[in-house]
Amino acid sequence: MSMLALDVEKRLGDFALAARFETAGGVTALFGASGAGKTTLVNMIAGLIAPDRGRIRLDQTVLFDSAARIDVPVHRRRIGYVFQEGRLFPHLSVAANLDYGRRMCGLARDGAETARILDLLDIGHLLDRRPGKLSGGERQRVAFGRALLMRPRLLLLDEPLASLDAPRKREILPYLEKLRDEVPMVYVSHHAPELKRIATSVVLLDAGRVAATGGIEVLDAATAELMG
């Protein structure tokens, strides 16, 4: 079980983010309105952008510390990231896309683990295809597989179902429930029913600040307030 602890500040134009929270494994939902700072936060955890000030720690590894001038490079953080649109390489086969993360992290090939993930996500029959020949749901499952084959300590999912229609979302949700037992996750979404099915804890963001943290009851209270 990976513990993530962060205390960060970041200004982007007129937007100022100041967030502090800890997670203790499971699936932590980042919930809030558009522009609340959810994607900015996961990009800082991944190392894609640096906080102006603060500290990010995963288990006993300090990933970022402005005071100590620590900023671990993206490829050394061992954090998987699945974006809204999957971001597969269109010129590579599914097999080559899956292998990309492992190679970038310098990991040895593990045939048994690869076979297990192919079975977990039901993508073994897609290996010879190019992303352009996949459905939206298949592309996202391949993106999940690529992230898992990095053997991540943490998986970041930024609106992974937002680009899918309702049938494809129903197709993917059972696979996400399986992933919940594979690796700790930070899951970004503004869709409460989706989070209620997957999340084990919630961080509510409002205009760049942490408004509340806790269990699913935080989500219930937030959605009730929005509807009220």
How should these model regions be labeled?
Residues 169-182:
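Helical segment within the ABC ATPase nucleotide-binding domain
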Residues 61-66, 109-126, 177:
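Conserved ABC ATPase "signature" region
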Residues 130-134, 138-140:
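Conserved ABC ATPase signature
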Residues 149-153:
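A short, proline-enriched helix->beta-strand linker immediately N-terminal to the Walker B motif
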Residues 63-80, 104:
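ABC ATPase NBD coupling module
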Residues 183-189:
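Conserved H-loop
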